[in-house]
């Protein structure tokens, strides 16, 4: 995940999660046992939790990274976009538009989100799935952040959602790999968004946001559509569609970058 998006995430503690009872801090193994009980109450099987938590330990690198983040952003839009949207990325995005033209037509018809917006997000997040999707075991990362007492309820909710991804059969534990806040896949969904918005668009019976391009793009479109994005309208700053993208990223500068990139892709 891009660090601007991570900085926004870690400042937001109002994500809708259930009231969770596991107590943060203290002995990590005791905390994991409490989380396992929470998971069982939420319908997660003992087989899943047992496999997920066997030998799990805190990851000091995750805490160190998290505590180093700066939650202010001082670049202008012009400075920021120049580092994120260059000729190579624009050309790569146009190639994706051509390669997946039929898929984009299906997605636009079902979800009403224009293809250039989806390609812009895809490119910014992981360079169209070719870049860094994160290399950390999501369960360990989220258990570490949930045990830390600063945003424990937020990350306990994400941890339970990650377990549900495994329970549903969407991804096996070996593929549940992500970034420093537990983001997963080619457009870097948090586990709660994976559960809420994920779409099996390739028809294989599971939502795979790491390997399936149809699932990745349709799920991204579903998130935007569900939050009010409408085909044919402006997506520039001040528009209803620009506001709908808040669910993707609260940062105005990031949403302006998505809009700028999208326009470049279609020659506007």
Regions found by a protein language model. Give the residues of each.
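Catalytic glycan-binding domains that act on GlcNAc-containing polysaccharides
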Residues: 44-268
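Bacterial N-terminal signal peptides that target proteins for export
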Residues: 1-8
């Amino acid at each position: 995940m891009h660090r601007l998006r991570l900085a926004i995430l870690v400042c937001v503690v109002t994500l809708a999660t259930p009231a969770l009872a596991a107590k943060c801090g203290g002995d990590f193994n005791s905390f994991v046992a409490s989380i396992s009980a929470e998971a069982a109450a939420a319908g997660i099987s003992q087989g899943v939790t047992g496999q997920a938590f066997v030998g799990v330990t805190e990851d000091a690198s995750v805490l160190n990274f998290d505590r180093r983040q700066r939650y202010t952003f001082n670049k202008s839009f012009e400075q920021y976009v120049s580092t994120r949207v260059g000729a190579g990325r624009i050309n790569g995005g146009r190639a994706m538009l051509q390669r997946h033209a039929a898929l984009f037509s299906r997605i636009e018809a079902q979800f009403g989100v224009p293809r250039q917006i989806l390609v812009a997000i895809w490119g910014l997040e992981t360079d169209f799935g070719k870049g860094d999707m994160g290399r950390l075991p999501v369960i360990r990362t989220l258990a570490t952040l949930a045990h830390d007492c600063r945003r424990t309820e937020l990350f306990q909710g994400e941890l339970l959602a990650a377990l549900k991804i495994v329970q549903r059969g969407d991804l096996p534990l070996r593929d549940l790999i992500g970034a420093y806040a537990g983001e997963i896949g080619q457009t870097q969904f948090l586990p709660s968004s994976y559960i809420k918005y994920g779409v099996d668009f390739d028809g294989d019976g599971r939502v795979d946001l790491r390997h399936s391009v149809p699932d990745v793009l349709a799920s991204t479109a579903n998130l935007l559509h569900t939050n009010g994005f409408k085909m044919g309208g402006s997506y520039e700053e001040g528009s209803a569609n620009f506001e709908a993208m808040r669910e993707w990223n609260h940062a105005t500068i990031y949403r302006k970058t998505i809009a700028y990139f999208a326009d470049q892709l279609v020659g506007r």
